[in-house]
Amino acid sequence: MLQLNSFAEISTLADRLPVADEAARAAALARQNSLTKPVGSLGRLEELSLHWAAWRATERPTITKPQALCFAGNHGVCAQGVNVFPQEVTHLMVKNFEMGGAAINQLCRAAGADLQ
């Protein structure tokens, strides 16, 4: 695993990233707009797919090894009274993820994605 020790190292690494392929983005947008659906009806997913097409330099990029990452924490939000569940529920929800009983598990299973 790559270890980065400073923001300068991250910046240097980012400078070496390939530039977006605008022709691929345009082709992906044209394809999106030709689909039988209202323009923009898939929300942010449409924007993400255009970014992915430009990044991969192809109109129809594929994801060969899908993976979902799940992060959980309380970070004091329960003390603010904005969460509908008590703090103890976080641990139980994560345990349910680990046991394969949550909606995210089913979505990952349907997509063939690994859940971490």
UniProtKB/Swiss-Prot annotation:
Gene3D superfamilies linked to this entry: 1.10.1610.10, 3.40.50.10210
Record gene name: cobT
Protein name according to UniProt: Nicotinate-nucleotide--dimethylbenzimidazole phosphoribosyltransferase
Keyword Transmembrane part of the UniProt annotation: no
Family to which this protein belongs: Belongs to the CobT family.
Pfam families listed in its UniProt record: DBI_PRT
UniProt superkingdom: Bacteria
Biological role: Catalyzes the synthesis of alpha-ribazole-5'-phosphate from nicotinate mononucleotide (NAMN) and 5,6-dimethylbenzimidazole (DMB).
Enzyme class: transferase
The keyword Acetylation is assigned to this record: no
Example of a GO biological process term: cobalamin biosynthetic process
Pathway: Nucleoside biosynthesis; alpha-ribazole biosynthesis; alpha-ribazole from 5,6-dimethylbenzimidazole: step 1/2
Catalytic activity annotation: 5,6-dimethylbenzimidazole + nicotinate beta-D-ribonucleotide = alpha-ribazole 5'-phosphate + nicotinate + H(+)
SUPFAM superfamilies: Nicotinate mononucleotide:5,6-dimethylbenzimidazole phosphoribosyltransferase (CobT)
Disulfide bonding pattern of the chain: none
One GO molecular-function entry: nicotinate-nucleotide-dimethylbenzimidazole phosphoribosyltransferase activity
Keyword entries, A-Z: Cobalamin biosynthesis, Glycosyltransferase, Transferase
EC number of the protein: 2.4.2.21
